[in-house]
A protein has these predicted regions:
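Helical scaffold of the NTase/Pol beta-like nucleotidyltransferase catalytic core
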Residues: 8-12, 19-61, 190-200
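A short alpha/beta connector and helix-capping loop motif
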Residues: 93-99
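Catalytic cores of NTP-dependent nucleotidyl/adenyl transfer enzymes across multiple folds
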Residues: 29, 138-200
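Short, solvent-exposed loop/turn segments at secondary-structure junctions
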Residues: 67-68, 133-135, 168-169
């Protein structure tokens, strides 16, 4: 018999599969607490990056706070977190260097991530993560990007932006000890699958 946690995970994965594309497009235009000009700038930068990454056939996806925003879980996001396949790091780096500037690395002992690079493109902060590793209670979890982790795409302008799964990031936040993020995702899943208010 499935426990509550397993049933909740299935509900979150179901949300991943069905997606929030139409709602996310509406949120970009009409909702959220971000300043409209600031939001437009971030979307313009994301569209520009997406065009170059996809043209160069990079394996990449959006994760973290921007993923939560696109899925309708969070109303704000601060930077653009990009997960990249390790073999594509150099090409990713070269593309972003042609668009903006690279910042200094700032390692965090909770992570043993093999590549973490900060960029600024048109005043928008970009975090590039490859070989993502989370350390939880002394155990290392390899969270490197894999093709099957891309569960859907959202369209920005004419560009198709790949998204990682919401259930996957719930697990990542749990390993990170980010309780508030886990609770936010759980409440969202409960709301979306509630009687009369969930997705069809």
């Amino acid at each position: 018999m499935k426990d509550g946690k397993e049933r909740l995970r299935e509900r979150i994965e179901g949300i991943d599969c069905r997606g929030q594309i139409a709602e996310s497009r509406f949120r970009i235009i009409c909702k959220g607490r971000l300043n409209v000009n600031e939001l437009q700038k971030k979307m313009d930068v994301l569209q520009k990056i997406t065009a170059e990454f996809n043209k160069d056939n990079l394996l990449w996806a959006i994760g973290a706070s921007l993923l939560l925003y696109f899925k309708g879980v969070a109303e704000v996001f601060h930077d653009i977190d990009i997960m990249v396949d390790e073999k594509d790091v150099e090409r990713c780096k070269n593309i972003l260097l042609n668009m903006g500037t690279m910042g200094a690395a700032s390692p965090d002992p909770q992570y043993k991530t093999r590549t973490f690079i900060e960029f600024t493109v048109d005043e928008v902060e970009i975090d590039v993560i490859a070989g993502f590793v989370i350390v939880d209670n002394g155990m290392e979890h390899d969270c490197s990007l894999k093709p099957d982790q891309i569960t859907e795409f959202i369209t920005i302008g004419k560009e198709h932006v790949p998204l990682q799964g919401l259930a996957l990031w719930r697990q990542y936040y749990e390993w990170m000890g980010r309780t508030s993020k886990v609770e936010l995702i759980d409440k969202f899943a409960e709301h979306k699958t509630g009687t009369g208010k969930g997705e069809r």
